[in-house]
Amino acid sequence: MDEIQEPLALTVHLLADTGNGLLLQQALDQLLECICPEVRLFLVSERARPVNYHEKYHPRRARFPGMSVLLFLQESLGQERLFRVLDFLRRSPWQGFPTQHAQGRSCSYLPANQEFYSLHNQMPVWGMRPVNCGTDILRVTLYCSFDNYEDAIRLYEMLLQRDATVQKSDFCFFVLYATEGFSLQLSLKQLPLGMSVDPKESSVLQFRVQEIGQLVPLLPNPCVPISSARWQTQDYDGNKILLQVHPKPGVGIKNGEHPFLNGCLRGDTHPQDSSLNSVSTQRTLEPRSRRRSRSRRFKVHSLELPQPSGSWENSTDPLWRRLGWSTLADSSASGMQQRRLSIPIEPKMGRNVLREDGFEKLEAETNVDTGFTIINSEPRRSFPSRFPRDFQSSQPPRCLSGSSLEVTVSPNQGVFKDRLHPLSLPSQRDFGAKKVISKCSHHLQAQGEEKEEFFI
């Protein structure tokens, strides 16, 4: 009997322009098929309406892309696979990413002959590096500004409910999935003092959580619902985060109401019988006085939800009406009415996961940009069933901005031991006492060579 694996705690949603969703999803599936076919980490959705990045997001001095995806592939498994991965990355819709500062100066600290790629200038930057030993690693890296690094560690430890494995003082990672020959990691990298982060606006990190009412008062920025099961917020550096609520088994639902909504609307910000109770009192995620003004500066750009015909007007749920969520102005481009935060609560909305031969199969999935449920009765390779018919004709994106990249590898990189246990309360953590972990087969090794950690 095949072992049933739990769904990943993290999903990376990529928001594509209209008509490009199918093409980008196929490009990702094709690339990852030869590395980790059993893992479905990246999901592409199409935006409800296009965004003009040139007007909204202006280039700033010394800003680094906030997210990268790095592939560490074993040379011992054959160079043919390495060449195949590079061949995929050099084809459309992939584009070469310029490794230079916004002022046009090249980055002298980049490794020789290192190439970077991206599907869009507001999506993660991709890179590939061959390694001599250990396992294949797919590493999603978030780059943190110097002052926010330790707070970011506490935040993601709380969301993932596990401790970070510290490799050195400015780099740590979480192992999300591991087999004998493959490891999936989320890592945090501290940027040098004075360098700011350029968040990728078309990239959204979605975490599976069991309780939302306990998390909301601990988050550094406002957290608002975009559907009955998902909430949107940001981390300290502006990276978009979605929290998808999966209540614990046995939690009842009465009259179509979700228990986590009741706690939030009643103002139960200090729940009893919770491992996060002491944390909410001390607010350890906001240790400095500068956090006071962060909420005032932060503007919540909720994902807009197109109104389906006749589906929301019939909603009589008093919880949602009590919050006063109403319609937005009509979209000038499509003439279709947009509605924000007004989805009726249904007990079975969200992702229903089926298992087939140890492989995750999606029965129903909520579109990250619209909040609607998308039915998918096919496994990974049948992506078109997840999109409407007009998504089938897709064109590749063409715009890439000149953001700067830095790639270094830790000089003391060895074989590391990962630690996966339940969350230690942030108030009980002493980051000055974190120790370097060694001797594990899941992480990158260096054989007598001085390498720097992949780093923007």
UniProtKB/Swiss-Prot annotation:
Superkingdom of the organism of origin: Eukaryota
InterPro entries associated with the record: FAM124, FAM124_dom
Name of the protein described by the UniProt record: Protein FAM124B
Keyword hit for Nucleus: yes
Family: Belongs to the FAM124 family.
Pfam hit, one: FAM124
Self-association state and partner proteins as the record states: Interacts with CHD7 and CHD8.
Subcellular location: Nucleus
Compositionally skewed regions (Polar residues) per UniProt: 272-284
Gene that specifies this protein: Fam124b
Region ranges (Disordered): 262-313
GO cellular component terms attached to this protein's record: mitochondrion; nucleoplasm
Keywords: Nucleus
Segments of skewed composition (Basic residues): 289-300
Tissue: Expressed strongly in lung, at slightly lower levels in heart, kidney, brain and testis, and weakly in liver (at protein level). In brain, highly expressed in cortex, hippocampus, dentate gyrus, caudate putamen and cerebellum (at protein level).
